[in-house]
Amino acid sequence: MMYHRLRKLGFIWNHKRVYRIYTAMRLNLRNKRKKRLPARVKAPLLRPIGPNVTWSLDFMHDTLASGKTIRTLNVIDDFNREALSICVDTSLPAHRVIMELDKLIEWRGKPEKIRSDNGPEFVAEAMRDWCERNTIEWEFIQPGKPTQNSLIERFNRTFRQDVLDSYMFESLSEARKYANAWVWMYNNVRPHSSLGHLAPTEFLLKYGKLSEFPTFQQDDNSESDWNSLVLGAAS
């Protein structure tokens, strides 16, 4: 088609020359078709009957003072809204997500199901293989329907208000320090209206089996760490 179009425009090059230039300009490469996702079925968002039934995952983005982009991988247990992890880094590909989930399972135990959106890290083949090896069901919400994962969305909003929008971080290590201190405060101190104004660990102690489901592990000075960070930033 290109050859005949050029001939009509008055160019008398032969078809071999046209093809040679065409391929040299890499115009002969096929367009990559967008990968179609399988149909997602809307699932009811129900409170699990206990810990480690359903975890919810999501990513967030922010920038350091230098302008460099950072990402966070947030993981919560839907039963008591407990923040199991906030992993902060500049890049969080599928293999890194798997590594973080393996760390969580090592101390928390394995969930029956994980819920997330259709991000490329979550739909990757490596993630499907990991789920099969660990016999974990992965529930994807429908594209463009973040309300179907509203528990982690609500958590993200709180984390952004309390930390990401409140402080400007100079380095990745500083962002991690604030995130870790905030997670401890969120799990052990901050009351949640959806939990009867109990903190997640208090709710787990009252309605779950705390001894069988350890919570976010950190030293005993975690609350004072968060308070000192907040007071230091305000001064």
What does each model-identified segment do?
Residues 47, 134, 158-235:
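C-terminal domain-tail junction helix/linker
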Residues 54-84, 90-92:
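An active-site-proximal beta-strand-loop segment
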Residues 7, 23, 27, 132, ...:
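Residue-level detection of the helix-turn-helix DNA-binding "recognition helix"
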Residues 64, 68-69, 86-108, 120:
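Active-site beta-loop-alpha junctions of metal-dependent nucleic acid enzymes
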Residues 1-54, 145, 199-208:
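Basic, flexible linker segments flanking DNA-binding modules
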